[in-house]
């Protein structure tokens, strides 16, 4: 009998599936109606469970929302860890990195995380710790992708914050207007900005 066939293995898989249903429920509700639409009762209802069962898996609505943001970060790190981003010329890597970021910013989980951040401006100590850890991972990743740049951690963080701010603004514009006019031109500008900054021109 394998672990997946054992009672413990089946229970673990069932628990994992339920957690995913809860998180997907929260993400879809936020996508459809914004942060306020993701009430505790509606998250549980859409997931097909009671709120008590949801609490068993996460503890509170706030824990669910924190988990959504964690997933968004994990998916971003998984994307930018792809080997192809570390291949080719500097210009090739800049183009690929910006495209990779943009693809992530179009995902429902990123948009849900953005809504959560905007709606809950008070930064908890736990979230601040998560932000710090995320920043360190992002800088490490940038050093790996742009290994031929001599920018310091501080300068790389400045570049990433600027790029993130521009692309988040473009993402919000796309959400509000249903489309982003001149999308490819905007992305080319982002690539030129990043290439200039990474080249330390």
State where each predicted segment sits.
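Short amphipathic helical patch at the helix-1/turn junction of helix-turn-helix
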Residues: 34-35, 55
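Basic, helix-initiating cap at the start of DNA-binding domains
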Residues: 1-33, 40-46, 63-66
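Hydrophobic alpha-helical connector segments
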Residues: 67, 80-110, 153, 159-163, ...
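Short helix-capping/turn signature of helix-turn-helix
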Residues: 58, 103, 115-123
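Amphipathic alpha-helical packing segments from all-alpha helical-bundle domains
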Residues: 77-82, 106-108, 124-150, 157-161, ...
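Short hydrophobic/aromatic patch on the recognition helix
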Residues: 47-58
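Amphipathic C-terminal alpha-helical segment
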Residues: 103-104, 119, 144, 163-181, ...
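Short, basic, alpha-helical segments at the C-terminal edge of helix-turn-helix-like DNA-binding modules
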Residues: 70-76
């Amino acid at each position: 009998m394998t672990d997946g066939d054992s009672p413990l293995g089946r229970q673990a898989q069932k628990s994992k599936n339920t957690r995913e249903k809860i998180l997907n429920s929260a993400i879809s509700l936020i996508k459809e109606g914004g942060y306020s639409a993701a009430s505790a009762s509606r998250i549980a209802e859409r997931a097909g469970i009671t709120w008590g069962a949801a609490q068993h898996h996460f503890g509170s609505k706030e824990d669910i929302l924190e988990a959504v943001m964690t997933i968004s970060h994990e998916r971003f790190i998984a994307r930018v860890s792809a080997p192809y981003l570390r291949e080719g010329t500097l210009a090739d890597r800049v183009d690929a990195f910006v495209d990779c970021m943009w693809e992530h910013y179009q995902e429902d989980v990123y948009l849900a995380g953005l809504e959560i951040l905007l709606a809950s401006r008070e930064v908890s100590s736990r979230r601040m710790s998560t932000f710090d850890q995320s920043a360190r991972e992002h800088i490490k990743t940038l050093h790996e992708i742009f290994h031929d740049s001599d920018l310091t951690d501080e300068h790389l963080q400045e570049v990433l914050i600027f790029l993130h701010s521009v692309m988040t603004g473009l993402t919000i514009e796309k959400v509000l207007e249903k489309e982003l006019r001149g999308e490819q031109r905007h992305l080319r500008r982002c690539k030129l900005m990043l290439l200039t900054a990474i080249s330390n021109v």
